[in-house]
């Protein structure tokens, strides 16, 4: 138990408050007051306490025992940090708003300084606390430690970047042995340990910040200092085999450009026995496709609605009220003149007119193309037979035919079957055919298969180029066979007609149409021959008087003047111009003749100005735009003030709610921190009962067939 007590340390004192007691203990929170008094040190004293610690760190005089605090000191500092923050939170409520904001700004600056100091200096490995407690340095509550920066500590200056030549341009020592795989693994392990220590520190800081209740630290975007980093090639990490070189040839000048293309010798593996492995012929090389994650239909619908482009969504009213987007000013460019594509260039009118000879030649060709087709002469006209219209053939009177119903047919067939069954069959033996005794009847002859011609596989290449020779099949002469005599002893049974599918022959509609037209023409000719034309005798011509058709005399072409469109347009214009000239000449003549007009002004009444009968303009009240805008501005400011008041009320409510939640959380945490031991559970005793099953009797297996009956 003593060892267990030494392992655990508690930050808070072991005193507890008895809430059941009636009297109040005023010194219950004395420990928290001590912590806050130790933390609230004036800035002058804090700087004095920090100076020796900083000097000790710079000179490197800090011992490992001092740098590695024990468990007790760490726990005390953690408790001091957490309780100090809680007390600071209590005191901040009494402070004014401006003072509280200043304190928050200072706390953020110190946090940023701590982070920059941690990133600049490499992480030191913490020493594990030994079981034997050694000499420890006294830790003052009020005085900050050398490892952590205070609130008013000056910001450390960044080290200046020193110029250095890159490793590519430096001449490397060829004789330097490359690191083995073990050394590389050790270096990698050290790097991982450093990263782990850094992560632990960050986690501790975040945990302390979460316990204290301060909000997330807002990091200022500080431009980091450029640090020169050497080139690191992947080939340097490979384990290389270095041959033992003689001592005399330690250094040789190597051409850098030529050495770039040379590859290092690959490590030679030791000759070992070949391990036979089975062939995995059944396994394929195809990778198994991973099953896609299940997505519900609701999620698919949501993703589909989100992925729809913006042009298909409804436009918001706010965007429409914003107004049109500012139009970019486009500079005017020079216009490139182009020739117009006029359609009049494509118009072509016939210049030459056809002459009378050409027109006659065309008409003659048209007459020659027309062919007169005479009908055949009916032979009956020349025979002198009496040509009369044919009488239509007299049709026979319709005879009534009864209906052939399927039911009646079936009834008749049944009656016939009954009649046939009634006839007694008498067997009459007939002589056996002699062919059955001499030859084999009813068994088909065995077909002789063709003899296989052997081909060597080595001549396969020759047969690739040459085409296979087509074997000419001999036309089989159809053998005339007599029908076999039926066996008269067996009754005759007719074979049923097999239902065969009709073979579809190729056809074309053009051939069918052509055949139909030929049949139609043939039928028309037959009808034309049957019909007899009515004979109409022509009058006898007068052989004494020859009547010739009148000769048509064509009138000679009369010359007419050309009626041009230009003349039509020019004539009215000329007429109008002549008329204008005549009118002008007439006016000039009239103006040249002087005619004095009578003096009428003397007899007229003198001019008297008249008074205007319009009424005076009535003044109306007006409202200035400035007054209107001033009223609107007052209303707007009033609404803004109301909004700000509402906002401040809401913020105050949220702040009070958060404070109440924090109080509840603190009270809940205090209740949870009190350890309450649970009683040892009591279980029922296990009653061991002996099993009733008999022991198994071993029997030797009979694998052979000798013992089987």
UniProtKB/Swiss-Prot annotation:
Could you tell me which InterPro entries the record lists for this protein?
Answer: Aurora-A-bd (IPR015128), TPX2_C (IPR027329), TPX2_central_dom (IPR027330), TPX2_fam (IPR009675)
- Chain positions with Phosphoserine modification: 206
Which keywords does this Swiss-Prot/TrEMBL entry list? Cell cycle, Cell division, Cytoplasm, Cytoskeleton, Microtubule, Mitosis, Nucleus, Phosphoprotein
- Superkingdom in the source lineage: Eukaryota
Q: Which GO terms describe its cellular component?
A: cytoplasm; microtubule; nucleus; spindle pole
Ranges of Basic residues composition bias in the record: 87-105
Renumbered to this chain, the Basic and acidic residues biased-composition regions fall at 106-117, 179-189
Q: Where is this region: Disordered?
A: 40-189, 229-249, 309-347, 641-668
Biological process annotations from GO: cell division; regulation of mitotic spindle organization
- Where does the record place it? Nucleus; Cytoplasm, Cytoskeleton, Spindle; Cytoplasm, Cytoskeleton, Spindle pole
Question: Polar residues compositional bias: what residue ranges?
Answer: 336-345
Query: What subunit structure does UniProt give?
Result: Associates with microtubules. Interacts with aurka and plk1. Interacts with kif15.
Role of this protein = Spindle assembly factor. Required for normal assembly of mitotic spindles. Mediates the binding kif15 and aurka to spindle microtubules. Required for targeting kif15 to microtubule minus ends. Activates aurka by promoting its autophosphorylation and protects the phosphorylated residue against dephosphorylation.
Q: Which family does it belong to?
A: Belongs to the TPX2 family.
Q: What is this protein called?
A: Targeting protein for Xklp2
Q: Record the organism.
A: Xenopus tropicalis (Western clawed frog)
> Gene that codes for this?
tpx2
């Amino acid at each position: 138990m003593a060892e267990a007590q030494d392992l655990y340390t508690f930050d808070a004192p072991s005193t507890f408050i008895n809430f059941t007691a009636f009297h109040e203990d005023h010194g219950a929170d004395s420990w928290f007051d001590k912590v806050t008094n130790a933390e609230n040190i004036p800035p002058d004293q804090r700087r004095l306490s920090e100076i020796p610690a900083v000097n000790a760190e710079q000179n490197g005089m800090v011992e490992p025992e001092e740098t590695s605090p024990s468990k007790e000191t760490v726990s005390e500092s953690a408790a001091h940090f957490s309780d100090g923050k809680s007390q600071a939170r209590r005191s901040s409520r009494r402070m004014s708003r401006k003072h509280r904001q200043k304190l928050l700004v200072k706390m953020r600056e110190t946090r940023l300084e701590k982070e920059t100091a941690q990133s600049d200096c490499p992480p030191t490995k913490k020493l594990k606390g030994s079981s034997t407690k050694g000499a420890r340095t006294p830790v003052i509550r009020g005085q900050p430690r050398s490892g952590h920066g205070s609130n008013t500590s000056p910001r450390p200056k960044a080290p200046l970047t020193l110029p250095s030549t890159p490793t590519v341009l430096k001449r490397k020592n060829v004789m330097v042995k490359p690191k083995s795989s073990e050394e590389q693994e050790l270096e990698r392990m050290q790097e991982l340990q450093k990263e782990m220590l850094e992560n632990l520190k960050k986690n501790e800081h975040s945990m302390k910040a979460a316990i204290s209740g301060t909000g997330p630290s807002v990091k200022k975007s500080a431009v980091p200092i450029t640090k020169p980093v050497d080139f690191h090639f992947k080939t340097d990490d490979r384990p290389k085999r270095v041959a033992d070189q003689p001592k005399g040839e330690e250094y040789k000048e190597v051409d850098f450009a030529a050495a770039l293309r040379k590859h290092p010798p690959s490590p030679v593996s030791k000759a070992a026995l070949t391990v036979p492995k089975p062939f995995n012929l059944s396994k394929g090389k195809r990778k198994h496709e991973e099953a896609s994650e299940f997505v519900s239909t609701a999620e698919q619908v949501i993703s589909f609605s989100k992925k729809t482009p913006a042009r298909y969504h409804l436009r918001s009213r706010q965007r429409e009220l914003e107004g049109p987007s500012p139009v970019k000013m486009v500079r005017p460019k020079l216009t490139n003149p182009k020739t117009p594509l006029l359609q009049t260039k494509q118009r072509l009118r016939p210049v030459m007119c056809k002459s009378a000879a050409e027109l006659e030649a065309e008409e003659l060709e048209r007459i020659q193309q027309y062919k007169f087709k005479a009908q055949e002469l009916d032979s009956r006209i020349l025979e002198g037979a009496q040509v009369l219209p044919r009488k239509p053939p007299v049709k026979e009177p319709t005879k009534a035919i009864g209906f052939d119903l399927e039911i009646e047919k079936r009834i008749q067939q049944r009656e016939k079957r009954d009649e046939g069954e009634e006839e007694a069959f008498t067997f009459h033996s007939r002589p056996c055919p002699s062919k059955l005794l001499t030859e084999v009847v009813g068994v088909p002859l065995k077909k002789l298969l063709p003899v296989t011609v052997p081909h060597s596989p080595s001549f396969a290449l020759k047969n690739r180029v040459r085409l296979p020779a087509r074997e000419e099949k001999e036309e089989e002469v159809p053998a005339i066979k007599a029908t076999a005599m039926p066996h008269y002893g067996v009754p005759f049974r007719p074979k049923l007609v097999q239902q065969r599918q009709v073979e579809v022959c190729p056809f074309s509609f053009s051939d069918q149409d052509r055949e139909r037209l030929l049949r139609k023409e043939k039928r028309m000719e037959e009808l034309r021959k049957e019909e007899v034309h009515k004979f109409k005798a022509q009058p006898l011509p007068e052989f004494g008087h020859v009547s010739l058709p009148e000769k048509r005399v064509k009138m000679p072409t009369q010359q007419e003047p050309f009626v041009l469109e230009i003349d039509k347009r020019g004539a009215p214009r000329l007429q109008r111009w002549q008329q204008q000239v005549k009118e002008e000449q007439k006016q000039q003549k009239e103006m040249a003749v002087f005619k004095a007009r009578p003096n009428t002004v003397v007899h007229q009444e003198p001019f008297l100005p008249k008074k205007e009968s319009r009424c005076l303009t009535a003044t109306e009240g007006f409202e200035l735009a400035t007054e209107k805008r001033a009223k609107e501005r007052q209303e707007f400011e009033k609404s803004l003030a109301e909004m700000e008041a509402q906002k401040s009320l809401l913020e105050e409510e949220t702040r009070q709610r958060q404070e109440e939640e924090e109080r509840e959380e603190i009270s809940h945490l205090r209740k949870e921190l009190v350890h309450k031991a649970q009683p040892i559970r009591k279980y029922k005793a296990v009653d061991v009962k002996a099993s009733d099953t008999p022991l198994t009797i071993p029997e030797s297996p009979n694998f052979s067939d000798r013992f089987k009956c």
